[in-house]
Amino acid sequence: MTGIPFGHHQSLAQVLRSYSQLVKPKIIALLLMTTAGAMWMAGNTDPFKFGVTLLGGGMAAAAANVINMVYDADIDRMMERTRHRPLPSGRIRARHALRFAGILAVMSFGLLACFTNLLAASLAMAGILVYVGVYTHWLKRSSPQNIVIGGAAGAIPPLVGWAAATGELSWAAWVMFALIFLWTPPHFWALAILKREDYARAGVPMLPVVAGERPTAAQILLYALLLVPVSLLLVYPLHVLGSFYLSAATLLGSLLIWKAVQLLQEPHSRERATSLFTFANLYLLLLCGAMGLDRWSLTHTLWDQALASLQGVYASLGALANHLGAMGSLG
């Protein structure tokens, strides 16, 4: 179709599909959930500012993903998982992708600066720089700790959300940063275990390639054990969230640790690695959802009623047990 200035496409729909793959929409959705969680926690309920922040933050994340794909096109060609992506397959040219990334970055900064504040806009741009400069350019091909240090880029979206909502960064925002920072290694290393051969073929020194599955599983468990208490700091001592979030974070954290223990017991099991990777995504999604629900007054009303009902049932069972015990002693 000559009206479309991109090779290897037969229709506009195919062009749009390729550009959608270029920005990695699933990753963006997960990152934006952390932005939303931070804004819910901060108490911002302005729908317009909320929507603009998610749109601007999503554009910044998309720009970073596109630049990353341009830089990594050579190794993507070597990996089975990535060789069909738009750049290594030749469906999109690098210069078109970079132009697209530049437009996204400028639009992101403009939206956030005009409709939220300069701090949020600057943090979004910092996220691009850290992801591209620190992770993609510096660490990804040189250090097995690449995802640990470079993972700071993925922890910036909640800072953007908090800054957009309040115009500043409080301790709660930095706890959110730490939470995502500690969540990233278990999430990414579980995937790296599954794709170990791919990374080895491309010469990328991911931890499972350099150290093997068992040491990687041990590191995953360590980060999971650190993550859970950090997630509870939002309840105490910060008192930003309440009992509903506390229960959700404790349950989700316990399940994450259990999944990590299972992987450590069977570090070569693809099933265990897949289970951990899937649950790590679900963990973050549900945890951020719990942040939003905890800030909703109706949630606390229903939660308190549920706890009161459980206490009533427990008291009734206790009274019944005592009554049966008394009858038994009389008999």
From Swiss-Prot:
It is an enzyme of class 2 (transferase). Carbon 2 of the heme B porphyrin ring is defined according to the Fischer nomenclature. It comes from the Bacteria. Gene3D superfamilies: UbiA prenyltransferase. One of its GO terms (biological process) is heme O biosynthetic process. It holds the Pfam family UbiA. Keywords: Cell inner membrane, Cell membrane, Heme biosynthesis, Membrane, Transferase, Transmembrane, Transmembrane helix. Converts heme B (protoheme IX) to heme O by substitution of the vinyl group on carbon 2 of heme B porphyrin ring with a hydroxyethyl farnesyl side group. This is Protoheme IX farnesyltransferase. It is a multi-pass membrane protein. InterPro entries: Protohaem_IX_farnesylTrfase (IPR006369), UbiA_prenyltransferase (IPR000537), UbiA_prenylTrfase_CS (IPR030470), UbiA_sf (IPR044878). It is found in: Cell inner membrane. GO terms for molecular function: protoheme IX farnesyltransferase activity. It comes from Synechococcus sp. (strain JA-3-3Ab) (Cyanobacteria bacterium Yellowstone A-Prime). It catalyses: heme b + (2E,6E)-farnesyl diphosphate + H2O = Fe(II)-heme o + diphosphate. Belongs to the UbiA prenyltransferase family. Protoheme IX farnesyltransferase subfamily. One of its GO terms (cellular component) is plasma membrane. PROSITE patterns: UBIA. The chain crosses the membrane at residues 22-42, 50-70, 100-120, 147-167, 174-194, 220-240, 241-261, 273-293, 307-327. Pathway: Porphyrin-containing compound metabolism; heme O biosynthesis; heme O from protoheme: step 1/1. Its main location: membrane. Its EC number is 2.5.1.141.
